[in-house]
């Protein structure tokens, strides 16, 4: 019987014993694009690096174990991963999508539907299972949720939504970027597919662009593998290695991100310059609204330790302004109606000393008048 290790152990051991010939503890980087054959029909299991690469395979097998899936797939970005999933469907298929969804996902779905006759996105408050069920029609083929959502941090009941998906024979896709398998395993809750922008917490150091898919079911996995090979938007060997290296400390980092975020959420609630704080009490992401839109630029220019940047999940604290960054492609009236106001800031709380983060926020707030 195979030993079932805890997730902390799986992460710490990622890549170890992956190269039996040398016994390398750190997974080697295989840069070769082609692999020799002994004869017709005789292969080492590797032929061409787009199809399969030894370093990428280590990452794909590791993320599959972490998410309790049947197979993992690594792509050149999170958006490339979503594009591959869209390729599984054809018009007039529809996806029910979280109304509070990452702006890049909105942009891809909107453009592909309007210009490429792709799946039609139907935006729903997926925090409400009844709202999801009310939106299901004969063309609905999948439900796509973020939990917590980006950037309003709304949580979805994956178990209840999975029951709905099964009842109506729909695929349930969960973006698990914010929580990672350390804090949530959607496949165990009934989802069919999990995706990650591995650029964020999984790689964790703001130095690798990564997309990941984990799926259950042989037929579905085979279809994804076929498209991955055909489309070719695969992760490079070096970025695969960076991700493997980064994920070794994922469990430790997530605990510190969460600990700091919980403290910062309480701190922000006590600040008179802050109108509201959005935090689901798990993970390292939160959002907050300033009292006055006119303060936003002054605040962003005033932070010194925290970086004003358009990403999340790294060791460093980042603040993002969704209105002009992540969600700028959503028309303003629609964006504001969804709750992504011009006073909203998204905060990826890093692993620095929490008192230093608080001090930076305080000195920035002091400039708001």
Curated annotation (Swiss-Prot):
Its cofactor is pyridoxal 5'-phosphate. Binds 1 pyridoxal phosphate per subunit. GO terms for cellular component: cytoplasm. Its main location: cytoplasm. Disulfide bonds: none annotated. Pfam families: Cys_Met_Meta_PP (PF01053). The keyword Hydrolase does not apply. GO terms for biological process: methionine biosynthetic process; transsulfuration. Its EC number is 2.5.1.48. One of its GO terms (molecular function) is pyridoxal phosphate binding. It catalyses: O-succinyl-L-homoserine + L-cysteine = L,L-cystathionine + succinate + H(+). It is found in: Cytoplasm. The modification N6-(pyridoxal phosphate)lysine is found at residue 200. Keywords: Amino-acid biosynthesis, Cytoplasm, Methionine biosynthesis, Pyridoxal phosphate, Transferase. Belongs to the trans-sulfuration enzymes family. Catalyzes the formation of L-cystathionine from O-succinyl-L-homoserine (OSHS) and L-cysteine, via a gamma-replacement reaction. In the absence of thiol, catalyzes gamma-elimination to form 2-oxobutanoate, succinate and ammonia. Homotetramer. This is Cystathionine gamma-synthase. It comes from Haemophilus influenzae (strain ATCC 51907 / DSM 11121 / KW20 / Rd).
């Amino acid at each position: 019987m195979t030993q079932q290790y805890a997730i902390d152990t799986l992460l710490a051991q990622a890549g170890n014993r992956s190269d039996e010939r040398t016994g390398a503890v750190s997974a080697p980087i295989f840069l070769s694009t082609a692999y020799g054959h002994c004869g017709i029909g005789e292969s080492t299991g590797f032929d061409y690096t787009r199809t399969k690469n030894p370093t990428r395979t280590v990452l794909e097998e590791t993320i599959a174990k972490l998410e309790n899936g049947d197979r993992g797939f690594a792509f050149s970005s999170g958006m490339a991963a979503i594009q591959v999933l869209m390729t599984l469907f054809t018009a007039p298929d529809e996806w029910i999508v979280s109304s509070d969804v990452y702006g890049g996902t909105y942009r891809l779905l909107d453009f592909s539907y309007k210009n490429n006759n792709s799946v039609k996105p139907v935006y729903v408050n997926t925090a409400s299972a009844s709202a999801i069920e009310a939106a299901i029609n004969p063309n609905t083929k999948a439900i796509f949720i973020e939990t917590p959502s980006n950037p309003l941090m709304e949580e979805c009941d994956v178990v209840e939504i999975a029951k709905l998906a099964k009842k109506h024979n729909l695929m349930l896709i969960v973006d698990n970027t914010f929580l990672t398998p350390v804090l949530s395993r959607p496949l165990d809750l009934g989802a069919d597919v999990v995706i990650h922008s591995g650029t964020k917490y999984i790689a964790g150091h703001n130095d690798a662009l990564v997309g990941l898919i984990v799926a259950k079911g042989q037929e579905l996995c085979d279809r994804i593998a076929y498209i991955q090979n055909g489309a070719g938007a695969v992760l490079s060997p070096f970025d695969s290695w960076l991700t493997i290296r980064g994920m070794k400390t994922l469990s430790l980092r997530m605990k510190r991100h969460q600990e700091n975020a919980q403290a910062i959420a309480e701190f922000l609630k006590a600040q008179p310059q802050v109108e509201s704080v959005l935090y689901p009490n798990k993970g390292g992401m939160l959002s907050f609204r300033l009292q006055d839109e006119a303060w936003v630029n002054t605040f962003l220019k005033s932070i010194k330790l925290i970086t004003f940047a358009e990403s999340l999940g790294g060791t460093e604290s980042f603040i993002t302004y969704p209105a002009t960054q992540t969600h700028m492609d959503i028309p303003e009236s629609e964006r504001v109606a969804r709750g992504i106001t011009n006073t909203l800031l998204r905060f990826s709380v890093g692993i620095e000393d929490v008192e230093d983060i608080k001090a930076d926020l305080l000195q920035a707030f002091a400039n708001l008048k």
